[in-house]
Amino acid sequence: MLFSLLVIFSMALSACGGAAATEAPASTEAPAATEAPASTEAPAATEAPVGEPVEVTFWHAYGTGSAEEVALTSLLEKAATDLPQYKINVLQVPFNDIFNKYRTDVAAGGGPDMFIAPNDDLGNDARASLIADITDLAAGKLEGVNQLGIDGMTLDGKLYGIPESLKAVAFWYNKSLLPTPPATTDELKALMESGQEVAFSFGCYHHYGFFDAFGGEIFDDNRTVVADQGTGVTDAVSYLNDLYQISKTNGWTKNDADGLAPFTEGRAVAITNGNWALGDYKNALGDDLAVAPLPAGPAGPATPMLGVDGFYFNPNSTNQEAALDVALYLTNAESQTIMMNEAGHVPVRTDVTITDPLIQGLVDAFNTGATIRPQVAELGKYWTNFCGTDQVFEAGTPAEEWVKTATEAANK
């Protein structure tokens, strides 16, 4: 059973304290994103001729032109001046490719010095020695970082990344079209049945929070899959199927990417998505944008997975100290304030002051029921066996039968 997060922030936060930038003797060129090559060579050694900057290769997966990419680019331009001892080579890799590309290149002895990504698979990557243990390297350097962020980058007492922000799925709505968001799953269904378009995001990641809301569990305390015990998971899948059929009948979108246009153009009154999209929504809707927790079910709050984004380091790299310096710069109080205000990131630092009601709304939503993402190997059983909901939504398999089949397959 995943552990529910009770209090994320006593981070309602102390005075904003931007970390002091190092003195820059001369301005350097801003790092530019490049297209991803088929493979990369092993990172270059830290030793560089006197007076020449050490090269640090950095990958990210922020979408082209997104608020996240724009904010990161501004930070990297500033870093080029504030950290003249480093030349930061930036590579943008599509999100769907970044993990596989990183693993393939690292296994071949190459890869970047570091990359930023959610802690989606930190546990498996750490167990496979694909990311570096930085416990000693980062010792004493995370002052001001909330323990939740550190925990999200930690496995078995070892630190594998520098935390940057918190992310989870929430309910975004247009106040000019929907003054009050649905507080319950019944209210959400009634809203959609009334013909008001909701860009509901379907998929096993987005579905996860609804199982608890209907009293279901995927795992017991021993990590055995127990989704077929009781009716909670089946009831949740049946409910999600009801919403899917409403969306299908009305020709509404069914994923967060396709839902961007109808929501930002004012056709959809709401969308379910993570706070990585806040910047894009805010740019389009301005003061009409609001956020709330996912609607609660008959058994209690929805419990979406709470992820931690962070910087991971390549065990092949001979530039880990340089990469760490860059990562610490990109996660200091000033940098996190910029990512918060411009890209909607929820900071992991306790010395960042929240002034945006949307960020505070996310904090409140996360506190309502978000669940810390576990880094256990057994989580793979969920992704492998519970992501094929099209068998219910499109092929018409009864929810109870589908849950039973998925559970049996997971426990083989």
Locate predicted features.
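Periplasmic solute-binding protein
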Residues: 123-130, 147-183, 202-222, 305-313, ...
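Conserved N-terminal structural module of periplasmic/extracytoplasmic solute-binding proteins
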Residues: 17-124, 298, 321-322, 338, ...
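A structural signal for short loop-to-beta-strand junctions that line the ligand-binding cleft
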Residues: 104-105, 112-113, 141-173, 197, ...
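Conserved C-terminal helix/tail region of periplasmic/extracytoplasmic solute-binding proteins
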Residues: 368-412
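Glycine-centered hinge/linker elements that transmit conformational signals in sensory
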Residues: 192, 223-253
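Hinge/lid segment of periplasmic solute-binding proteins
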Residues: 48, 119-170, 180, 185-189, ...
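Extracytoplasmic "Venus flytrap"/periplasmic binding protein-like
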Residues: 75-145, 154, 160, 176, ...
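Extracytoplasmic/periplasmic substrate-recognition and gating elements
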Residues: 54, 77, 81, 245-248, ...
